[in-house]
């Protein structure tokens, strides 16, 4: 039996789509030295090659892919998006604006200089910034621009071509820049990170190990009674001195949870909760009494929960003001915009931040109710909210504003982005509304992006050979300029205008470029995870600004002559 693969793929759009995705994802696993190609470029390369053989896909699949992707970008940005505008994130907002704005202006200038059309120019901007949101925003705006069919088809093909030719240039140049730019400035990144650590009482170890608290029990002996000197637990400040707290006391056979007025007496049996190293450092006065192995005394339910910051008495407060340890709870992690932050007593909490807290189940529940809510332990997505806000986003995208002879519409990209932000923001404020497990959100976002990349590659593949011959050299030069010059401008602005700490500044610059591989290099150079503070500060807002940049470049292009 003979199987004509070409006819089989051309006759089945779904099969073709998943063949492209499978081959592209395999290609994306390849590494060039320390650089991995990545899923996006793998799928794009495979789709361009198959596009040269005149394979094509239904445009509805392409549109659905980009819609899912941009909506999920908004959902991820939502919890922290508004805090960037309304509080101490103004420096991060300004850095993101400088990075995206300078790249947009430079791309427009180079596009006019080389005589390109809007498709090549917008594609070059998206590729050089390694930003699929730019590509998505520009593509959607082009489709709603009113161009005649043939001109629109050429612009969309050139959009994909420009992106494909400059993506690797943008990625490699930024990674090289992240490795060497810190060495070209006068301040050592490791020293800058240590300075922040000293000022804020941070652990600078990027690979800090997290342990669960353990419980051990001791019988109070004469040494411990002498050590307490008749003071109650509040006056002693047990946690400050030992790193452990007394969870239970058995006295005369009666088991009780002590309050701050309790005074230890000879023969008491006490249950201490703390990290393993805190137990190891206990004063000998504790260990001189006999260790007790009592099931009832040691029977505590130690849990670890993810607590979402929501309530007004926690939002805007510093981490130290929560006094978690005074309530018998231990903080393991602080996560903002899916980025793990250093545990810093001076970190100001934003609505939607996630604190991973360990301790007795009752105490953790109490602290969670005080600062927000415990994240739902469910793998069930609120599909009703997801679909409803998706519809709202599409309807917002249909709105058109008319000014004399000029009309302006938000388009699907901006509408879905806004609706996604609102869903993410509302989820951060209402624990039972709009829940989407992070794994599900990441899967939908990644799948939507891959479908979109497959579609644009197949549609642009037929013209890539001509494009490479005519504009390959120009694209290389333009890609390097748009990738690196905004980074230098952003550095100068942050270092000499905003006067930011260099470790935070370089982290924020990589966040403004939404480039995780470059961020890892900055953290390695600083030998600290402190740059993650800056990365998280700009990441959410940069994703939104990059999408808008794709829309803006298409809108302003006709007016430049």
Swiss-Prot record:
Keywords: Cell membrane, Membrane, Repeat, Transmembrane, Transmembrane helix, Transport
One Pfam family recorded for the sequence: Asp-Al_Ex
GO molecular function: monoatomic cation transmembrane transporter activity
Top-level lineage group: Bacteria
Chief place of localization: membrane
UniProt GO BP: potassium ion transport
Subcellular location: Cell membrane
Leader sequence segment: none
Membrane topology designation: Multi-pass membrane protein
Ranges annotated as spanning the membrane: 8-28, 32-52, 66-86, 94-114, 158-178, 383-403, 406-426, 451-471, 475-495, 540-560
Span of domain RCK C-terminal: 200-288, 292-373
GO CC term, one of those recorded: plasma membrane
UniProt-listed PANTHER family: K(+)_H(+) ANTIPORTER SUBUNIT KHTT, TRANSPORT PROTEIN YBJL-RELATED
Family to which this protein belongs: Belongs to the AAE transporter (TC 2.A.81) family. YbjL subfamily.
Protein name stated in the entry: Putative transport protein YbjL
